[in-house]
Amino acid sequence: MNEELNLDLMCGEFKSTLDAKGRMNFPVKVREMFGTSFIISKTIDAECIKVYSLEDWHELVTKIKSLPQTQTAAIQRFLFGSAFQTEPDKQGRILIPAPLREYAGLESDIVIVALSGRAEIWDKAKWDALNSADDTADLAKTAMELGI
């Protein structure tokens, strides 16, 4: 991870497309934040792919493995079983393995969302639906309740 850049300040939405081989251009700004190698995995709370720095992934693995196996076995299978370490090629593309593409419904148009220290990769149609006017109204209500 680039020490001069603050991962917590990383924000933004970036559009990309998948090629026929399942590769996508990973935005330079996001690549700089995560470094030359990072982990991509399913996300528990949404049908998208989560991007982890190697440091954050190691912390997550350590935390989960410190908890009772009886309580975390399903979580370990879900997250660890779907995780892939990836590195951008010379053109800045990363391969999204078929199981992750299928899980997130990625076909062509995608959105990379940088969320203050983490990133998610979404199918564009799912991302647009998530950000519909109805959902935005619910978010505004929740934000006000939380004092944001």
Protein language model regions, located:
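Flexible "stalk/tail and boundary" regions
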Residues: 1-16, 20-21, 29-86, 90-91, ...
